[in-house]
């Protein structure tokens, strides 16, 4: 069937399946980091100043240290090629506590807002109990 438009340059949107296939073919820019315990992880090259704890040791990807491989079987040489801008500010946040234990709310003896309309447990009838058990 011939197109209804006389124009020869028809523009159509690329389907999402084709876009996904193209995106999957793009190489992932990441580096492999080997830990002292023998484990390794892959770090995206645009990711810096994020850390995690593994087997009791804290690891931080500062971005200043990168691996330059000399060959197949040679050890990696660590070099400091640049300084990345700091991604996390040092400002204190609302959840920052210098001590490890977070303060707990005090328990009260009065009615809470949630249970303020409940009747006294002594006033609950047998039919109320059977209804609650059926739930």
From Swiss-Prot:
Record keywords, A-Z: Activator, DNA-binding, Host cytoplasm, Host nucleus, Host-virus interaction, Inhibition of host innate immune response by virus, Metal-binding, Phosphoprotein, Suppressor of RNA silencing, Viral immunoevasion, Zinc, Zinc-finger
The UniProt record lists the keyword ATP-binding: no
Motif (Nuclear localization signal): 17-32
Bias kind Polar residues: ranges: 77-87, 101-115
GO BP terms in the entry: symbiont-mediated suppression of host innate immune response
Ranges for region Transactivation: 120-135
Start and end residues, zinc fingers (unnamed): 37-54
Entry comment on modification after translation: Phosphorylated.
Any one GO molecular function term: zinc ion binding
Keyword Nucleotide-binding: no
Subcellular localization(s) per the UniProt record: Host nucleus; Host cytoplasm
UniProt xrefs under Pfam families: Gemini_AL2 (PF01440)
One of the record's GO cellular component terms: host cell cytoplasm
Principal localisation: host cell
Renumbered residue ranges of the record's region Disordered: 77-117
Domain of life, source organism: Viruses
Domain comment as written in the entry: The zinc finger and the transactivation region are involved in PTGS suppression.
SUBUNIT field: Monomer. Homodimer. Homooligomer. Self-interaction correlates with nuclear localization and efficient activation of transcription. Monomers suppress local silencing by interacting with and inactivating host adenosine kinase 2 (ADK2) in the cytoplasm. Interacts with and inhibits host SNF1 kinase. Binds to ssDNA. May interact with host RPS27A.
Membership in a protein family: Belongs to the geminiviridae transcriptional activator protein family.
Protein name: Transcriptional activator protein
Organism: Tomato yellow leaf curl virus (strain Israel) (TYLCV)
């Amino acid at each position: 069937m011939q197109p209804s438009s006389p124009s020869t340059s028809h523009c159509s949107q690329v389907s999402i399946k084709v876009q996904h296939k193209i995106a999957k073919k793009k190489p992932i820019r990441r580096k492999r980091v080997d830990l002292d315990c023998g484990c390794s992880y892959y770090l995206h090259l645009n990711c810096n100043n994020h850390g995690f704890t593994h087997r009791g040791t804290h690891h931080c990807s500062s971005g200043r240290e990168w691996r330059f491989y000399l060959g197949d079987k040679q050890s990696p040489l660590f070099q400091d090629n640049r300084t990345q801008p700091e991604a996390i500010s040092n400002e204190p946040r609302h959840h920052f506590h210098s001590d490890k234990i977070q303060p707990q709310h005090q328990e009260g003896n009065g009615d809470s807002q949630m249970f303020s309309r409940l009747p006294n447990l002594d006033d609950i009838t047998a039919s109320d109990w059977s209804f609650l058990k059926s739930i």
